[in-house]
Amino acid sequence: HFLARFYGVLFLCLEVILMNADVVIVGAGPAGIFTALEMLRRGSSKKIVMVEKGRALEKRSCPKVKTGVCMNCRPSCHITTGFSGAGAFSDGKLSLACEVGGDLPTLIGERLAQETIDYADKIYLEFGADEHIEGVGNDEKVRRIRARAIKAGLKLVDCPIRHMGTEKAHDVYLGIEHYLIDHGVEMYFDTECRDLIMEGDTCRGVYLSDGKK
């Protein structure tokens, strides 16, 4: 629940249950994935549904590999949508310092931001991420480069990186997908959230592209 709060994932509790769900998570990107994982790890007995307009990870493939040009896939791009979002086909670099990557430290404080990064990193390790970290153990080189950067009016941010690589990132996310399914999370792929069901200021559910709610 705290990861959901930090990353702003759409986290909906349903009172009118027409999909046999207590909780709907819209989007199976990192925020949605970690929300579902956190609920399971905290012993939630709620029926969880994830709604994702892209495909399951094992069914995602880009035709550009064969055609050499973007085919503008419809209804959605296989690279940017689907389980784990664009991260599944990235080079899998995880920045492990709160000084880079956004304004989370400003919003919640540096200590809590770093604790959250460390917590998420441990989960990646549990699912098979490489234990080696780049960017550590070169203190003297970093010191010299930082001194040169200061003279040039620049700020050097020393950030450790866990580099999974494209294939390993794919395997890690596939393992997480199977874990969620095996632990009862129901996934609606190729399904888009079209609208919210509102009662005053309270969200009671969602309307989906397949007609369900």
Model-derived features with residue positions:
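Gly/Ala-rich phosphate-binding loop of Rossmann-like dinucleotide-binding domains
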Residues: 36, 40
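Short, Lys/Arg-enriched N-terminal segments with co-localized hydrophobic residues
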Residues: 1-18
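Conserved N-terminal/central alpha/beta ligand/cofactor-binding core
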Residues: 53-186
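A conserved short coil-to-beta-strand element within the FAD-binding core of flavoproteins
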Residues: 189-202
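Core beta-strand elements of the Rossmann-like FAD/NAD(P) dinucleotide-binding domain
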Residues: 20-21, 209-213
